[in-house]
């Protein structure tokens, strides 16, 4: 199925690209979430008429994401207290939600879906650098310090 992308999609293309995708991917993800339209003659004309508006919207989203990334990078280390054993091993773990809640409490809005923990949840005390993806093109690093509760 041929579609016109209305947003930048990782590993697929950017705004205005006409790409061929599987019908299920288009029907279940791209079309319902407004990330693409079916590539027919009428939609191509409508898209070309709205191209400048859509590009301006994407530029505004990118500017907002960049500003948020700068705020996140400017944060001092976010401290999270958790119960831990004598050797610094946590009873449980610190996951995406815990990090997002701690950063939000520190003053910068952060959703748990934006936190990237490629090695899994944090299971020991110490200092960690956690990657945060606020936009498909914008990433920031947040310093997280996990300490044992007294």
UniProtKB/Swiss-Prot annotation:
Keyword Membrane: no
PANTHER family: 50S RIBOSOMAL PROTEIN L9
Described purpose of this protein according to its UniProt entry: Binds to the 23S rRNA.
GO molecular function: rRNA binding; structural constituent of ribosome
Cysteine pairings via disulfide bonds: none
Keywords: Ribonucleoprotein, Ribosomal protein, RNA-binding, rRNA-binding
Protein name: Large ribosomal subunit protein bL9
GO biological process, one term: translation
Family membership noted in the UniProt record: Belongs to the bacterial ribosomal protein bL9 family.
One Pfam family this sequence matches: Ribosomal_L9_C
InterPro entries, sorted: Ribosomal_bL9, Ribosomal_bL9/RNase_H1_N, Ribosomal_bL9_bac/chp, Ribosomal_bL9_C, Ribosomal_bL9_C_sf, Ribosomal_bL9_N, Ribosomal_bL9_N_sf
GO cellular component annotations of the record: ribonucleoprotein complex; ribosome
């Amino acid at each position: 199925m041929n579609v016109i992308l209305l947003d930048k999609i990782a590993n697929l293309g950017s705004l205005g690209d006409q790409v061929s995708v599987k019908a299920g991917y288009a029907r279940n993800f791209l079309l319902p979430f407004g990330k693409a339209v079916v590539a027919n003659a009428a939609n191509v004309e409508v898209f070309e008429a709205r191209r400048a508006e859509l590009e301006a919207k994407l530029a505004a989203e990118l500017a907002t994401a960049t500003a948020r990334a700068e705020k996140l990078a400017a944060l001092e280390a976010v401290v999270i207290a958790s119960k831990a054993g004598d050797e610094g091993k946590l009873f449980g773990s610190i996951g995406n939600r815990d990090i997002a809640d701690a950063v939000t409490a520190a003053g910068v809005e952060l959703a748990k879906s934006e936190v990237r923990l490629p090695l899994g949840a944090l299971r020991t005390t110490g200092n960690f650098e956690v990657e945060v993806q606020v936009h498909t093109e914008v990433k920031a690093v947040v310093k997280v310090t996990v300490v044992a509760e007294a």
